[in-house]
Design a protein with these regions (language model features):
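C-terminal motif of bacterial Sec signal peptides marking the signal peptidase cleavage site
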Residues: 21-25
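N-terminal low-complexity, Pro/Thr/Ser-rich intrinsically disordered segments
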Residues: 37-62
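Tubular lipid-binding modules of the TULIP superfamily
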Residues: 56-80
Length: 268
C-alpha cells in the first residue's frame, strides 16, 4: 500500500472510531453491592443526605485546569445516544444502570447531573506537504490519535439514601448481567453487549464498583471499562474507551488513575 493510502486509511479509522466513541458515551447536564471491591469505608448509610444542585456539581467536576495532558469539555459537545433516559431501551431492566453509564446518563434516579469528556491531548502534525517526511509525520500523529483514551466523567446527586440505592443497583447489575444486554434508542443502531465482568475498583470514595463490558464493533470484539464511585450523596461515574480498541486493535487499557484521583480530590 502506498504511503498516502495508508494515511487516508488511518484517518478514516481514527474518525470512525471517534464517532462511535462519542455515540456510545455522551449525554448532557441535568437539573433534575459488593461495593468498594471489599476495600475502603464500605457502604454505610449517609446521614440525611441532601442532593447537590447542578450548579454545585458543575463546580466540583473536573476541568481542563485540573488535568495536565487532557482536553476536558462538556460531553454534550459530542453526539448523543439519546436525549433522555426515557428514550433508552434496555432488553433486561436489571441491566439499565450499566446501559445508562455507557450512554452518558446517571445510573440512578438523580436529582441533578453533569458530565465531562476528558481526552488525552495529541500533538497535531506539523507537516502539511506530501513529501515522504511529511507523510511520516502525519501518519505518526494518526497513530497517536488511535492510541489515545477518552473518558466520560459524570457526577449525579441524590436525596436521602438514593446514592446508596444506586450503588446497589449497579452492583446487582454487574452480577446479574454477566451474559450481556442490548440497548437501543430512536434513531440509533442497536448496541449489543455480550459480556459484563466485575473488575478491581480504584477503592475511591465511600464505595465503588468497576466493570468491563464487551461487545461487537463492525465485526470486531471491543471491551470498554467503567467505574461507579459514591462520595456521600454524590455518585461519580467513569467510562473509558480506547480508540485503538474500537479500531479493532488489541489494546490493554483501563480508566486513567489520574482522572479518578483528581475527581475524588475535588469531591473532598
Amino acid at each position: 500500500m502506498k504511503r498516502s493510502s495508508r494515511v487516508r486509511v488511518g484517518a478514516t479509522v481514527a474518525v470512525s472510531a471517534l464517532s462511535l466513541a462519542l455515540i456510545t458515551g455522551c449525554g448532557g447536564d441535568s437539573g433534575s453491592g459488593d461495593s468498594k471491591d471489599s476495600a475502603g469505608k464500605g457502604s454505610s448509610p449517609t446521614a440525611v443526605a441532601k442532593a447537590l444542585s447542578a450548579a454545585e456539581l458543575g463546580k466540583r467536576i473536573i476541568s481542563e485546569q485540573d488535568l495536565d495532558g487532557y482536553e476536558v469539555k462538556s460531553a454534550d459537545k459530542g453526539g448523543k445516544f439519546a436525549e433522555s433516559k426515557d428514550q433508552v431501551t434496555v432488553v433486561d431492566a436489571k441491566c439499565e444502570p450499566l446501559a445508562y453509564v455507557l450512554t452518558g446518563f446517571a445510573p440512578g434516579d438523580e436529582s441533578a447531573y453533569v458530565n465531562r469528556m476528558a481526552t488525552e491531548k495529541v500533538a497535531e502534525p506539523t507537516s502539511k506537504g506530501t513529501s515522504e517526511e511529511s507523510l511520516d509525520d502525519i501518519e505518526d500523529s494518526l497513530k497517536d490519535i488511535v492510541g489515545s483514551t477518552m473518558t466520560i466523567v459524570s457526577l449525579s446527586s441524590y436525596d436521602g439514601g438514593g446514592a446508596e440505592q444506586t450503588m446497589k443497583s449497579v452492583s446487582d447489575a454487574v452480577a446479574g448481567c454477566a451474559s450481556g444486554f442490548t440497548v437501543s434508542a430512536k434513531g440509533q443502531d442497536t448496541q449489543k453487549f455480550t459480556k459484563v465482568a466485575e473488575e478491581k475498583s480504584s477503592g475511591s470514595g465511600d464505595e465503588s464498583v468497576a466493570f468491563s463490558v464487551t461487545g461487537k464493533t463492525e465485526g470486531d470484539t471491543t471491551t470498554v471499562h467503567a467505574e461507579v464511585v459514591r462520595h456521600g450523596s454524590t455518585v461519580a461515574t467513569y467510562y473509558s474507551v480506547s480508540l485503538a480498541a474500537l479500531a479493532g486493535k488489541k489494546d490493554k487499557y483501563g480508566i486513567p488513575a489520574e482522572i479518578i484521583k483528581t475527581q475524588a480530590a475535588k469531591l473532598g
